Amino acid sequence: MATFKKQIKISGQGIHSGEKVNIVIRPSGEEGIFFKRVDMANSGLISAKFDNVGETKMRNTTIGKIAGAHVQTIEHLMAALFMVGVDSAIIEINGPETPILDGSAAEFIKEFEKVGVVGKKPKKIIVKKEVIVRAKEVLKQLPMIVRMKLWLMNKIMGRKVDGFVKLSPSSDEKLNIKATLVYKEKIIGSQTYEYGFCQTKESYDDFVENIARARTFGKYSEWEYLKKRGMGRGANEGNVIALNDAGDGTLNELIWPDEFVRHKIIDAIGDMFTSGGFVVGNLESYKGSHALNNLVLKKLFSNPENYDIVEE
């Protein structure tokens, strides 16, 4: 179990509300990452665990209950916590979403490095048996009206519902991630990125240099659509890669041509850390999503024979 040496204060905009958000990350002697909504009376602690991930209309990871105390878009912050090895903290927040900052994990990591970490490495969750979740299986579990809306949206956008996320045993002591995106937009097309993390300084430095700065992305027209419906109000060209309507370019400059899929590595790492530890295994994500990441963890933990837990 590891925590920060002292408290950290971070402020920024919520990507959906557009409002200023303040978080205070406090060191903790209890295992686990917990959020506390200081803007709500009797919020209590909200566990950042896979079994506390709630439903959301937005493409992010949300913990808690949407109708009550919840925190959304935690994945970039969780990825940064994972990378510095902190699995024990209480995060006080004065709103329903974490600050988007620059749309990546880099700014969180910079703040964490200023403070330092004390304690042991997080426990290892070793994948023993393969588990897989397919998008088609998820769709079957949704209400008919929701399925019809998604079917229509996918048909309009020319997307096939053939995505999956798979966890399988690894031959090494790493979390090996292979992420693949397939978009009809020419600027993205088909992109694959592979990354293996093994809790060493070299691996950490590689992440900071080659992945941490990758930003979230979306179409400019989609951005305007969301704003009209009270969402995406904090999105701007400083924190989101904005694709033009033709899909053959972006309104802001890319850091790497495959920045899109590199960002999916951040999302996957953040979601895997809701396991409560360092997942040792191979994670393959083909046209994956936050929902599939969460469901594959639920499937993993549904049977004790699927995994081992090793304390550091």
Residue ranges and their predicted role:
Residues M1-D87, E92-E312:
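C-terminal regulatory domains involved in ligand/effector binding and gene-expression control
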